[in-house]
């Protein structure tokens, strides 16, 4: 009479069958009848790269500084306007420059504030494995926001610094010198933060690539 034999199962059931755990993509070979090793405490949390944390903090502080400096940028001064008559004294007119007068600067402040809020949320979720991919996608969006905001603000700043002779737009930074200097300082800090976000995104992709069990 034919003796019955246990068929090897996926979880190690069956007489003398080798167990194979499919909890990971590579699998874990346990040998005949061997028990699976217990998961170490905290093994569900992804490894934290100190460089990524430092870059994230820099992006957080850089976007905060850029948004605050630009949002607080304001200057009031007086300009002289020549009167119609040659012998009449020039008129002194008070004028004010504010970041809200430029849609490019408004977009710059809003974009930096959004990236700051995202960076704070990403730091809070740094130990969550389920947040790795959403944070990576968010970094991509944040980087695009920062570079576009920097480009818009820098273009408007250069227009105020140099003017445009083709359309007869006069430069205004000779009148609003401190205003332009603070605005360009905020743009430079945001540009550095954007490059830091780019490096952070590349490190995150490299970390996921190394940790993936397909490679």
Curated annotation (Swiss-Prot):
Record keyword Cell inner membrane present: no
Cellular location(s): Cell membrane
Keywords: Cell membrane, Membrane, Transmembrane, Transmembrane helix
Residues exposed to the Cytoplasmic side: 1-51, 125-130, 207-215
Membrane topology category: Multi-pass membrane protein
InterPro entries membership: CASP/CASPL, CASP_dom, CASPL
GO CC annotation, single: plasma membrane
Amino-acid biosynthesis keyword on record: no
Cysteines joined through disulfide linkages: none
Entry's transmembrane regions: 52-72, 104-124, 131-151, 186-206
Ranges of the Extracellular topological domain: 73-103, 152-185
Main location: membrane
Extent of the signal sequence: none
Pfam families recorded: CASP_dom
The family this protein is said to belong to: Belongs to the Casparian strip membrane proteins (CASP) family.
Assembly description: Homodimer and heterodimers.
NCBIfam families from the UniProt entry: A_tha_TIGR01569
Protein name stated in the entry: CASP-like protein 1E1
């Amino acid at each position: 009479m034919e003796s019955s034999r246990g068929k090897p199962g996926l979880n190690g059931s069956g007489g003398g069958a080798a167990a194979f755990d499919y909890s990971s993509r590579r699998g874990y070979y346990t040998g005949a009848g061997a028990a699976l090793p217990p998961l170490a405490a905290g093994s569900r949390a992804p490894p934290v790269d100190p460089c990524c944390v430092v870059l994230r903090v820099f992006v957080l502080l850089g976007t905060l500084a850029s948004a605050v400096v630009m949002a607080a940028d304001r200057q009031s001064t007086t300009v002289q306007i020549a009167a119609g008559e040659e012998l009449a004294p020039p008129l002194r007119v008070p004028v004010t420059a504010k970041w809200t007068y430029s849609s490019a600067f408004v977009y710059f402040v809003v974009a930096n504030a959004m990236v700051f809020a995202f960076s704070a949320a990403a730091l809070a979720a740094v130990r969550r494995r389920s947040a790795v991919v959403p944070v990576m996608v968010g970094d991509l969006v944040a980087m695009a926001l920062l570079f576009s905001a920097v480009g818009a603000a820098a273009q408007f700043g250069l227009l105020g610094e140099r003017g445009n002779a083709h359309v007869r737009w006069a430069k205004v930074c000779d009148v609003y010198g401190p205003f332009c200097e603070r605005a360009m300082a905020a743009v430079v800090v945001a540009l550095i933060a954007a490059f830091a976000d780019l490096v952070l995104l590349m490190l995150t992709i490299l970390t996921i690539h190394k940790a993936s069990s397909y490679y």
